[in-house]
Amino acid sequence: MSACISPSDALLARRLIELTQAGLPLVADPWAWIAAQLRLSEAETLALLKRLRDAGVIRRIAAVPNHYRLGYRHNGMTVWDVADERIERLGRLVGGLSFVSHCYRRPRHLPQWRYNLFAMVHGRSEAEIEGYRQQIRLLLGEDCRADEMLVSSRILKKTGLRLAQKEERPC
């Protein structure tokens, strides 16, 4: 993928980000709303989004639930030491579990950090997330050489890209 886009798409992309950086509007048809704000048709807006995705400017558009407001106040990043040659298969198994929100591979930093497979779980209690950890441990079986669970000590709010507003300059 190339991050090169046309100058006109770059201007539209900036406006699109400014319009949506706080989230998509809660309207019946957010694409129609965005199209109207950009002074484009819906088809042109969707084509713009596709071009931006194809160029690697946009990776994805997705709903991001607030786990805390949904009652999931306990989080655990489970970390696993598994054989590097088996991590792809094992990661797919773990990532496919319904209670794993995201799962990925990270480099080891030996001797301080031996873990290479990470899986985030959310629950309504410490016991629930510990139960999820046990389920992952059972799934990995003998492939799991060691594991730990890192728990959140405070809430960190994730945000998307934020652009500074352009300064208005007098003529």
From Swiss-Prot:
Pathway(s): Porphyrin-containing compound metabolism
Question: Any idea what a deletion of this gene does?
Answer: The nirDLGH mutant lacks dissimilatory nitrite reductase (NIR) activity. The NIR activity is restored by adding purified heme d1.
GO MF annotation, one: lyase activity
Q: Supply the alphabetized keyword list.
A: Lyase
Domain of life of the native organism = Bacteria
Keyword Membrane annotated:
no
> So what does this thing catalyse?
siroheme + 2 H(+) = 12,18-didecarboxysiroheme + 2 CO2
Which EC number(s) does the record attach to this protein?
Answer: 4.1.1.111
Which residues does UniProt assign to the signal peptide? Answer: none
Query: Which InterPro entries does the annotation name?
Result: AsnC_trans_reg2, HTH-Siroheme_Decarb, NirdL-like_HTH
Q: Does the keyword Nucleotide-binding apply?
A: no
- A biological process from GO: heme biosynthetic process
The family note in this entry says: Belongs to the Ahb/Nir family.
Subunit record text? Probably forms a complex composed of NirD, NirL, NirG and NirH. All proteins are required for the total conversion of siroheme to didecarboxysiroheme.
What is the role of the protein in this entry? Involved in heme d1 biosynthesis. Catalyzes the decarboxylation of siroheme into didecarboxysiroheme.
Q: What is the protein named? A: Siroheme decarboxylase NirH subunit
Q: Which gene encodes it?
A: nirH
